[in-house]
Design a protein with these regions (language model features):
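Gly/Ala-rich phosphate-binding loop of Rossmann-like dinucleotide-binding domains
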Residues: 10, 14, 151
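Conserved Rossmann-like nucleotide-cofactor binding loop
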Residues: 5, 30, 195
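General small-molecule cofactor/ligand-binding pocket signal
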Residues: 23, 110-113, 158-160
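Glycine-rich FAD pyrophosphate-binding loop
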Residues: 14-38
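Helical element adjacent to the flavin cofactor pocket in flavoenzyme catalytic cores
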Residues: 131-187, 191-198
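Glycine-rich Rossmann-fold phosphate-binding loop(s) that bind the pyrophosphate
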Residues: 1-7, 27
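Local beta-strand N-terminus motif with an aromatic residue
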Residues: 18, 74, 185-186
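Dinucleotide-binding Rossmann-like beta1-alpha1 core, especially the glycine-rich loop
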Residues: 41-121, 127
Length: 201
């Protein structure tokens, strides 16, 4: 799959194992056309994840690495922070747990804001309270996709488009059957997004 996960995986493999052959099979005419191309562009910092969990640790490290990658490739991004807004007392109570979770995940600068404080930041926001999360960010994910493609190709990898995997066969090697041809490899990494279960079958 040629979404953000498949492309980032290919890039890492090429960096960690110089000289290997890596091919990304993408079913669409261009990479990043599904979930990657339609997401909100938010860089999540780990606020919502269980403290100590792998997901929380990867979110904290991932936002750092993504900001570094974007700076290196001149990709529009900003660590602009966000407000988590409580619209009623029940949400305000839950926000305290979110605050504690964020602190446990190592997020610095979290601030509890009252209605006046949050409206100083965003005058048009509705709600009774907010949690200011300075580490959250935004990014142009289509630009990230194109930078990953360029880097993969510069490292000797290839992106094969219009290559929907219609079948997989295992003998001495794996062979992926696609409309663009059959491709054999020692290893296949399934990064097919929402369709990864179908590919696995």
């Amino acid at each position: 799959g040629g979404g953000i996960v498949g492309l980032a995986t290919a890039r890492q493999l090429l960096h960690h194992y110089p000289g290997i052959t890596v091919s990304v099979l993408e079913k669409e005419p261009e990479p990043g056309q599904h979930q990657t191309g339609h997401n909100s562009g938010v860089l999540h910092c780990g606020l919502y994840y269980t403290p100590g969990s792998l997901k929380a640790r990867l979110a904290v490290e991932g936002i750092r690495q993504m900001a570094e990658f974007c700076s290196l490739h001149n990709i529009p991004h900003e660590i602009c922070g966000k407000l988590v807004v409580a619209t009623n007392e029940a949400e305000a109570t839950r926000m305290e747990k979110l605050y504690q979770r964020g602190k446990a995940n190592g997020l610095e600068g979290l601030e509890k804001l009252d209605q006046n404080q949050m409206r100083e930041i965003e005058p048009h926001v509705g709600g009774i309270a907010a949690l200011k999360v300075p580490q959250e960010g935004i990014v142009d994910y289509p630009a990230v996709v194109m930078a990953l493609v360029r880097e993969i190709e510069s490292l000797g990898g290839q992106i094969i488009t219009n290559a929907k995997v219609n079948g997989l066969h295992e003998a001495n090697q794996w062979t992926a059957i696609t409309p663009a041809g059959d491709y054999s490899a020692d290893w296949i990494i399934n990064c097919a997004g929402l369709h990864c279960d179908r590919v696995s079958q």
